[in-house]
Amino acid sequence: AYAAARGADRMSSYGDWVALSDTCDVHTAKLLQREVSDGIIAPDYTEEALEVLKTKRRGTYNIVKIDPNYVPAPIEHKDVFGVTFEQGRNELKIDEAMLMQNIVTENKELTEEAKRDLLIALITLKYTQSNSVCYAKGGQAIGVGAGQQSRIHCTRLAGNKADIWFLRQHPKVLNLPFVDNIRRPDRDNTIDVYISDDYEDVLADGVWEQFFKTKPEPLTREEKKEWLATFSGVSLGSDAFFPFGDNIERAKRSGVQLSLIHISEP
């Protein structure tokens, strides 16, 4: 689960906090060991996991244990410049039943994969700053657009991230001849530039030698378009309604299967 969540956006290269809903085992700790991270919070840790995590950041890695039985207050309070705001805590229950409440298209069937991905998208949105849109596929979030002033900007931002997620799986990208011992953040950042229109920034003479053993061929715009045209089976969630059809049109370009109603709102 951690690997899938991390893979949603590899450009979080220089620090994050990891939140786990279950005990951190040694396998998760070893995955985390090689990533740049500022801390982890979880209900418990195995002894083996603790030994691994204690080696991060020369022993200064933040490891926080939470009470899994803690129940927060139903009313939240926030103070802003001396003014106190109160609001009910978001206790929305996201489950399969809510997906089946109001299917408006002729096709009323959702595959098990679609249900899983829609639930993942909606759970992600529950804890994401509004306005927000999430694309999901294969049991993981692949693009999140958050905190935008308009819904279409959320859809575009999340769609662009989903496209990048898929482009990272292009055969040319998977076979890039990186130099030995390249740092993981450098590799991720190099891939991000390579698949963009600014690929010359990493392929120019005198530059590519820093990252590659041999100079790769660029991933052309035509190749990217052809690859993205095969992108399908994506689910999409939104934390509010779509006011205009432009959101639907943009989502479709990133593989959202509208015929299966892969769009949901909590």
Question: For each predicted feature, which ranges?
Answer:
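ATP-dependent carboxylate/acyl-activation modules
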Residues: 1-258, 264
